[in-house]
Amino acid sequence: MPKNAVVILRYGPYSAAGLPVEHHTFRLQGLQAVLAIDGHEVILEKIEDWNVVELMVNEEVIFHCNIKDLEFGGDGKLDPLCEKARIAVLNAY
C-alpha cells in the first residue's frame, strides 16, 4: 500500500477501569501513531460492536483485534498488535 493511504479505524465501546461502557480512544493512540508515522491518514469511526477494533483499507477489513489487547496510551512502537496492524496496512492492495 502506498504512503498516504486512507485507513478507517473502526472501534467499539468497552469498559475501562470501572468507567461505563463507552467509545474510549485511549487504547487507540499507539495504533494511530504507528500508522501516522508511515504517512497514512487515519479516520476514526465508532461502531456498536463491543471490544472491537477493525482497520479498513479500500472498503475491506484488513485487520481486527480486541481493543482491550492494545496497550494503553503510548506511541505503539512496543505494542506487537500495532506492528501487526501496520504490516496489514502495508500489505493491503
Swiss-Prot record:
Alphabetical list of Pfam families matching this protein: UPF0728
Cystines in this chain: none
InterPro entries for this protein: UPF0728 (IPR027885)
Family statement drawn from the similarity comment of this UniProt entry: Belongs to the UPF0728 family.
UniProt protein name: UPF0728 protein C10orf53
Organism listed in the record: Homo sapiens
